Design a protein with these regions (language model features):
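Helix-turn-helix repeat elements of alpha-solenoid scaffolds
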Residues: 7-17, 78-88, 115-124
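C-terminal soluble interaction/assembly domains
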Residues: 102-170
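Residue at a conserved register position within TPR or TPR-like alpha-solenoid repeats
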Residues: 5-6, 42, 114, 150
């Protein structure tokens, strides 16, 4: 279903990271390209802990760090590890400014960052506050990420309800 969706002419590539997140939850193991793509996209999106986890999963599954890609995989893993450590040290400092912001974007992003750090309750609470605050450029994308957060937290009923409520056109 996820790969069929990406072949539609209306597919928007900005959802690629979300698709990889869903694949990661649904499948036992991704292929090396998907792990590295997920890590790269997560770094670009500002979620280094998610990137670190993707690389760690790939290495644990035994599909990363081999052959001609061993060097690039190690470099990406090192970059993700460094940025994740920095993010863990500095994440709390962003909370006050996200709360004061006119729109909920900062709260949604900060909340998802906490979710990637397995601080599900705190992260989901911030995401819900951000969505309720409004002013989001892409509300359905924020709701999609909240649904993913619910699923990662094991809140199946909330995840299903959130997924069912999505009405995006992309």
């Amino acid at each position: 279903l996820l790969s069929r969706m990406q072949r539609k002419p209306t597919w928007n590539d900005r959802f690629r990271l979300d698709v990889l997140r869903l694949q990661d939850m649904a499948m036992k193991t991704l292929d090396p390209l998907e792990y590295s793509e997920m890590a790269e996209l997560a770094l670009l999106a500002g979620f280094p802990t998610e990137a670190k986890k993707a690389m760690d999963e790939g290495y644990a599954a035994g599909v990363m760090g081999k052959g001609n890609n061993a060097g690039p995989h190690k470099a990406l893993r090192d970059k993700a590890n460094k940025q994740a450590a920095d993010d863990a040290k500095n994440i709390a400092s962003g909370e006050a400014s996200a709360m004061k912001s006119k729109d909920g974007t900062g709260l949604v992003n900060l909340g998802y960052a906490y979710v990637t750090m397995d601080q599900f309750d705190k992260g989901i609470s911030l995401m819900e506050k951000g969505i309720a605050k409004g002013g989001l450029k892409r509300t359905d994308e924020s709701k999609l990420r909240l649904a993913i957060a619910y699923a990662k937290a094991g809140r199946k009923a909330d995840a299903i309800k959130a997924f069912e409520g999505l009405k995006g056109n992309d």
